[in-house]
């Protein structure tokens, strides 16, 4: 068989060093610098042997912070920090007649969701999970796929 291992890592650090007066409020500067996790990684294992194959992918998102935006004081004094998360995806496939492939899999198979939204106004407006989450809030997604190569 053949095993491919791939690791990718992002280190993000945004620093706004100069803001023209009254261009944006301090809360927006805070959000631009902190709403993206400082670290995120993807580790993928892709195995194939003959007609069978499979993929396991582990996604990591570091914690991130945000302000209430329009609903806060605007000076960056009120912030919320949301925790880090690990998501796992899995997929298996079988190829036959050298052109048809049947695949089953799942994304976020442990049904992880972002932390609950801390801002009361956004919660009142219907936001259950952090609206600035770096990943979706719909939980697990399962699928089956049939494909053909011509």
Which residue stretches match the model-derived regions?
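C-terminal beta-signal and adjacent terminal beta-strands/loops
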Residues: 60-67, 93-150
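Residue-level detector of the transmembrane beta-barrel scaffold of outer-membrane proteins
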Residues: 2-6, 44, 53-55, 91, ...
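Generic long, charged, amphipathic alpha-helical segments
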Residues: 58-60, 67-91
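Residue-level preference for alpha-helix termini and adjacent loops
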Residues: 29, 81-86, 108-109
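Residues that define the transmembrane beta-barrel architecture of outer-membrane proteins
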Residues: 37-41, 84-88, 138-142
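Extracellular loop and loop/strand-boundary signature of outer-membrane beta-barrel proteins
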Residues: 26-32, 73-80, 129-134
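Gram-negative outer-membrane beta-barrel transporters
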Residues: 1-68
């Amino acid at each position: 068989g053949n095993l491919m291992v791939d690791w990718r890592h992002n280190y993000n650090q945004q620093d706004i060093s100069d803001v023209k007066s009254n261009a944006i409020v301090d809360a927006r500067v805070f959000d631009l610098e902190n709403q993206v996790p400082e670290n995120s990684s993807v580790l993928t294992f892709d195995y194939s042997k003959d007609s069978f194959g499979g993929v396991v992918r582990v996604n990591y998102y570091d914690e991130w912070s945000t302000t209430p935006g329009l609903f806060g004081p605007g000076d960056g004094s009120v912030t919320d920090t949301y925790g880090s998360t690990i998501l796992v995806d899995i997929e298996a496939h079988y190829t036959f007649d050298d052109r048809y492939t049947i695949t089953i899999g799942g994304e976020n198979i442990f049904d992880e969701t972002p932390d609950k939204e801390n801002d009361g106004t956004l919660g009142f407006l219907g936001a259950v999970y952090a609206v600035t989450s770096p990943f979706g809030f719909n939980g697990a997604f399962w699928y089956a796929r049939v494909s053909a190569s011509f």
